[in-house]
Amino acid sequence: YAFKLMGVLQRASLNIITNPYPNSVLQNRTDGYPRRRGCTRVDELLAAGVNVCIGHDDLMDPWYPMGKGSMLGAANLLMHTAQLSGYDQIGQLLDMITVNSARTMCLEDYGIEEGNSADFVVLDADTPFDAVRLTCECLYVVRRGKIVCETAPARRELRFGGRTETIDFKL
């Protein structure tokens, strides 16, 4: 049934939004053990050509008061709950919080191109893999070509045996 439904979703050009934070906490919480993860069939939907994006709709409310609005955090959690940890799947996760979401919202001027609104973020990561793996800091948020938010990354120092070393966990 699910396979047939995915074909219908794709032909109807419907969009699927998965919300990893609240879904992982709220769905199936009355199940016995082993408990299901509360996550949809993301990999199967993507393989069927369905547009899937990641949402984060509960920030500080009664259903999920632990949210902080990090889309990279939501992608990281989905990476675990949907078992999308392959190197080739990291790009799909990033697309789900950018390109696929823009498609869901019918944004026509999306992307970095002449004439578009120049909305983008600068991440503290050397690779897309590290961006998702480390849920790195967003150094800059640029909206309509102007910096609207700037974050100084945290600095971690390990002190051991009289030595101090800076640790960033990057590969």
PLM features: what roles do these ranges have?
Residues 1-4, 32-40:
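Charged helix-capping and loop-helix junction motifs
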Residues 91-171:
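Active-site microenvironment of metallo-dependent hydrolases
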Residues 31-32, 67-70, 136-138, 156:
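Short, glycine/charged-enriched secondary-structure capping and boundary segments
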Residues 18-28, 36-123:
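His/Asp/Glu-enriched, well-ordered alpha-helical/loop segment
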